[in-house]
């Protein structure tokens, strides 16, 4: 099934009333465009991949190791409008962080050290993860990003920005304070992006409106979300100039998931660790990613599993980049067979045959994202630990995924 797509022409002063600013509720209704319509590309380092995605040569070396040389539906649909400078609204379950980061990296002027892109997210963890994604994808371009989430003074923020931060990532309240306090100069910002836009607009509507008032009139907008309420969609349109609107159907995104899903009944929380160790011994899992819901649980479970004699690493929003890189390298090299992580999103470089939900995510979309982590169409298994308190959420997840998750069979070792 093709995504629903409506589009726009490139902004110009003539089209927006003479001053380049058409961010109001009277925006012209979008006109239909074809997904594979060819647009003239004058930049020499832009190449096409599978006829629908544009990735710069400078990014190719890095993205090939992350399966972006085989773009997903969401990558194909989102990156092209971003690279062409168009406003975009995209609703999809997977890939939004990578899509928006690729688009930003190809729109930056690397001769300038001014802040040129502003990305807002609802949580501190997602801000740090987005910073990490830009750092990894943009390492050959010398792109510099920083997460601004509070805990720093206006002077400290200014000092960080003065080092040449080209992409500022942050939470709405703190970023608005930076703009009001003149710690962040908006004059050179050319892209304004919301990830998890539905949640951001629902919880920080006034702050978003305040931030937009500081932006240059020709700023490109990109709003991305796994879900999009009618109210949020109308708010997006209010601020944009004839946006490209992309809705990737859920059934299309689910087609690439080739993972067998099971659950394990656990009497109480204290029994989970023994169940987990039993799985390791029974299944002889070479590598597994274990998902928990909080940083504290990630830290405590890491120590408990390590105490059982297993090699384990952990990544979450509370660790520094160097420690995160070390944990990923250990897992990729095989020196650590277990990786414990929280609800982090971004570049999926971690391939593992098993995903284990030690804590069941409270949001179905988080479950789906984790199920497809590291698979890219490859076979795998996902196992959820279910206590009596998880039953309602577990039922919601099954309905959302349109699947019946079965109890883990005794011959589980044959599944890998």
UniProtKB/Swiss-Prot annotation:
Residues 258-416 form the Helicase C-terminal domain. It catalyses: ATP + H2O = ADP + phosphate + H(+). It comes from the Eukaryota. It holds the Pfam family DEAD. ATP binds at residues 92-99. Its main location: cytoplasm. A motif (DEAD box) lies at residues 195-198. PROSITE patterns: DEAD_ATP_HELICASE, HELICASE_ATP_BIND_1, HELICASE_CTER. One of its GO terms (molecular function) is ATP hydrolysis activity. GO terms for cellular component: cytoplasmic stress granule. GO terms for biological process: cytoplasmic translational initiation. The keyword Kinase does not apply. Residues 79-246 form the Helicase ATP-binding domain. InterPro entries: DEAD/DEAH_box_helicase_dom, Helicase_ATP-bd, Helicase_C-like, P-loop_NTPase, RNA-helicase_DEAD-box_CS. Its EC number is 3.6.4.13. Keywords: ATP-binding, Cytoplasm, Helicase, Hydrolase, Initiation factor, Nucleotide-binding, Protein biosynthesis, RNA-binding. The Q motif is unique to and characteristic of the DEAD box family of RNA helicases and controls ATP binding and hydrolysis. Belongs to the DEAD box helicase family. eIF4A subfamily. ATP-dependent RNA helicase which is a subunit of the eIF4F complex involved in cap recognition and is required for mRNA binding to ribosome. In the current model of translation initiation, eIF4A unwinds RNA secondary structures in the 5'-UTR of mRNAs which is necessary to allow efficient binding of the small ribosomal subunit, and subsequent scanning for the initiator codon. eIF4F is a multi-subunit complex, the composition of which varies with external and internal environmental conditions. It is composed of at least EIF4A, EIF4E and EIF4G. This is Putative eukaryotic initiation factor 4A-2. It comes from Oryza sativa subsp. japonica.
């Amino acid at each position: 099934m093709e995504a629903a797509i409506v589009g726009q022409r490139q902004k110009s002063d003539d089209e927006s009333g003479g001053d380049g600013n058409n961010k109001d509720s009277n925006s012209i209704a979008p006109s239909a465009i074809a997904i594979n319509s060819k647009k003239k590309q004058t930049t020499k380092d832009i190449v096409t991949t599978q006829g629908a995605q544009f990735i710069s040569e400078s990014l190719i070396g890095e993205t090939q190791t992350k399966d972006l040389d085989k773009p997903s539906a969401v990558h194909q649909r989102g990156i092209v409008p971003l690279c062409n400078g168009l406003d975009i609204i995209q609703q999809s379950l997977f890939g939004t962080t990578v899509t928006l980061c690729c688009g930003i990296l190809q729109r930056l002027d690397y001769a300038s050290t001014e802040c040129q892109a502003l990305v807002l997210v609802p949580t501190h963890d997602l801000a740090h993860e987005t910073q990490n994604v830009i750092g990894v994808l943009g390492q050959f371009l010398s792109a510099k990003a920083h997460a601004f989430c509070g805990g720093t003074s206006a002077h400290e923020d200014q000092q960080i920005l003065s080092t040449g931060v080209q992409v500022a990532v942050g939470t709405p309240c703190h970023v608005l304070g930076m703009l009001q306090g003149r710690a962040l100069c908006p004059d050179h910002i050319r892209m304004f992006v919301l990830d998890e836009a539905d949640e951001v607009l629902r919880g920080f509507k006034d702050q978003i409106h305040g931030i937009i008032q500081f932006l240059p009139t020709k700023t490109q907008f990109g709003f991305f979300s796994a879900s999009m309420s009618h109210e949020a969609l109308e708010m997006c349109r209010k601020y944009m100039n004839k946006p490209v609107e992309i809705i990737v159907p859920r059934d299309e995104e689910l087609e690439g998931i080739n993972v067998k899903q099971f659950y394990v009944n656990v009497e109480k929380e204290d029994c989970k660790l023994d169940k987990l160790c039993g799985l390791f011994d029974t299944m002889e899992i070479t590598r597994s990613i274990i998902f928990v819901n909080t940083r504290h649980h990630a830290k405590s479970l890491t120590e408990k599993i390590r105490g059982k004699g297993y090699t384990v690493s952990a990544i979450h929003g509370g660790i520094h980049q160097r420690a995160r890189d070390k944990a990923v390298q250990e897992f990729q090299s095989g020196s650590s067979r277990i990786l414990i992580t929280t609800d982090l999103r971004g570049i999926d470089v971690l391939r593992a045959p098993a995903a284990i939900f030690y804590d069941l995510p409270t949001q179905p979309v988080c479950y789906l994202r984790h199920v497809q982590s590291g698979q890219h169409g490859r076979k795998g298994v996902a196992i959820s630990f279910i206590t009596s308190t998880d039953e309602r959420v577990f039922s919601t997840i099954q309905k959302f995924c349109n699947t019946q998750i079965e109890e883990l069979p005794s011959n589980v070792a044959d599944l890998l």
